[in-house]
């Protein structure tokens, strides 16, 4: 797989209450990813960028919500997220990652 493509697959970590609970309980990390990325690309990208071993990847499409601004109704974009399960003994600390 092209390394340039792998560096662009992961857009951002998802930091929320649910993601911290999943991280503590199941040793998983949640990322916002490109909408056309597949599980294989996500696994390779995480292993390349964070130097960890990945055991499993689950992906989910998140539907954009309808939002209102005054009398105008708009819609947020759909996006894709990946639940990445790390091997025992590995972890990703976003506070120390540059």
From Swiss-Prot:
One GO term of the biological process aspect: translation
NCBIfam families, per database record: PRK05738.1-3, PRK05738.2-4
Protein family: Belongs to the universal ribosomal protein uL23 family.
Function: One of the early assembly proteins it binds 23S rRNA. One of the proteins that surrounds the polypeptide exit tunnel on the outside of the ribosome. Forms the main docking site for trigger factor binding to the ribosome.
Domain of life: Bacteria
Record's GO cellular component terms: ribonucleoprotein complex; ribosome
Assembly mode: Part of the 50S ribosomal subunit. Contacts protein L29, and trigger factor when it is bound to the ribosome.
Gene3D superfamilies for the chain: 3.30.70.330
Keywords: Ribonucleoprotein, Ribosomal protein, RNA-binding, rRNA-binding
Lineage: Bacteria, Pseudomonadati, Pseudomonadota, Gammaproteobacteria, Chromatiales
Keyword RNA-binding: yes
UniProt name for this protein: Large ribosomal subunit protein uL23
Disulfide bonds: none
An MF annotation (GO) of this entry: rRNA binding
Organism, scientific name: Nitrosococcus oceani (strain ATCC 19707 / BCRC 17464 / JCM 30415 / NCIMB 11848 / C-107)
């Amino acid at each position: 797989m092209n390394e340039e493509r792998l560096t662009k697959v992961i857009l951002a970590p998802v930091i929320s209450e649910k993601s911290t609970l999943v991280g503590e309980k199941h040793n998983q990390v949640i990322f916002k990813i490109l909408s056309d990325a597949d599980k294989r690309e996500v696994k390779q990208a995480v292993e390349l960028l964070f130097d960890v071993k990945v055991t499993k990847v689950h992906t989910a499409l998140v539907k954009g919500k309808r939002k209102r601004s005054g009398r105008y109704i708009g819609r947020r974009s759909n996006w894709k997220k990946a639940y990445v399960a790390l091997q025992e003994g590995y972890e990703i600390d976003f506070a120390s990652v540059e």
